[in-house]
């Protein structure tokens, strides 16, 4: 696969379950990063933030065809900063639903639950769109503009829904790691989120949003 200009649309075939599930295990570098990422989770929340930053770097390399896609977590400062920005974005996206849920609970306003739940579902649905475009183009506006993320998710159409199906399946499978004395979940959860990063980087059209 040749390198491509970031201004060119990347029309990727929808990823399959098999390729998506195997991608985080496909190379020695990938397996090394998975093991390191899982071990990092022992130092929460820093480990979780590092994994998030690492995942965004991998998404960038997938789009720009910069193999090997898995190049470790160094420099740690860069990876941590990128993860912190993405963590802030998650908080921004989920804030409206969490505020409504808190008010509903504290003041016993049942009607607010009918606002909080849809807002939570919508925010969760569009987050991968925003994260993917931020990762691919270093466009930080997607981290604080849920409306732009929604536009990308909508643009993704059925491919975006297909990516969600694979992603949710991987997340559910990751809970099998709890059977390995619980500690296995550290590694299966990292595997699942590596799958998530891969499927959304493949499924979205990834058209550079210049002037939009």
List the predicted regions and their residue ranges.
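Selective recognition of hydrophobic, aromatic-rich stretches within alpha-helical transmembrane segments
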Residues: 41-64, 105-144, 175-211
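Interfacial aromatic "cap" segments that immediately flank transmembrane helices
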Residues: 18-41, 73-99, 125-176, 202-212
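Short, small/hydrophobic-residue-rich motifs at membrane-helix boundaries and re-entrant hairpins
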Residues: 2-29, 36-68, 72-124
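Intrinsic structural disorder
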Residues: 1-3, 171, 182
């Amino acid at each position: 696969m040749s390198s491509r200009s970031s201004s060119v649309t990347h029309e990727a075939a929808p990823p399959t379950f098999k390729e998506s599930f195997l991608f985080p295990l496909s190379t020695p570098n990938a397996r090394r990063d998975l093991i390191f990422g899982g071990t990092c989770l022992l130092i929460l929340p820093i480990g979780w933030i590092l994994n998030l930053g690492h995942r965004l770097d991998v998404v960038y390399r997938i789009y720009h065809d910069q193999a090997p896609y898995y190049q470790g977590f160094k420099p740690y400062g860069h990876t941590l900063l990128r993860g912190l920005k993405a963590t802030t974005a998650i908080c921004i996206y989920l804030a409206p639903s969490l505020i409504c849920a808190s008010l509903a609970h504290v003041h016993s306003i049942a009607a607010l639950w009918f606002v909080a739940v849809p807002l939570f579902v919508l925010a969760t649905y569009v987050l991968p769109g925003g994260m993917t475009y931020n990762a691919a183009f270093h466009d930080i506006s997607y981290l604080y503009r849920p409306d732009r993320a929604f536009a990308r998710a909508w643009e993704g159409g059925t491919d975006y829904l297909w990516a969600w199906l694979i992603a949710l399946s991987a997340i559910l499978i990751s809970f099998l790691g709890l059977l390995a004395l619980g500690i296995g979940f550290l590694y299966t959860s990292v595997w699942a989120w590596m799958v998530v990063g891969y499927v959304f980087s493949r499924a979205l059209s990834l058209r550079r949003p210049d002037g939009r």
